[in-house]
């Protein structure tokens, strides 16, 4: 089956990546730190603006805007770099897949779409029962967006029905 991705220059893209078999590998902080390190290293090769992110035990969400490249190049480079370094750090020499084969993407269409996906990202740790308040999840851009005035502490403390129903995973 051929999978078609749509590339629209200067567009922000919502991306979901999932660990193979949903193994909660990001429950270990050293893997989260490797994720951040390898994502930063990827930005040395490919230019992009990262608007928002969250890393959960078995998946991650990003809102990013490629600059002069496409998001598939960014994700391919990141996932390969991450897997190679994970294998090296863990003494794995055999064939090994850290990630599910593909990632999911959605091109953001307008400000409302951006805000919906931003909320989804920041509410996701609550939705999955990792924490009861978004600010308690440290592997997220939520507090940076609080500082920017997009949220007030208290947002997400009560159940947000429309976000509970959404599933981009």
State where each predicted segment sits.
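Short catalytic/metal-binding and nucleic-acid-binding patches
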Residues: 1-169
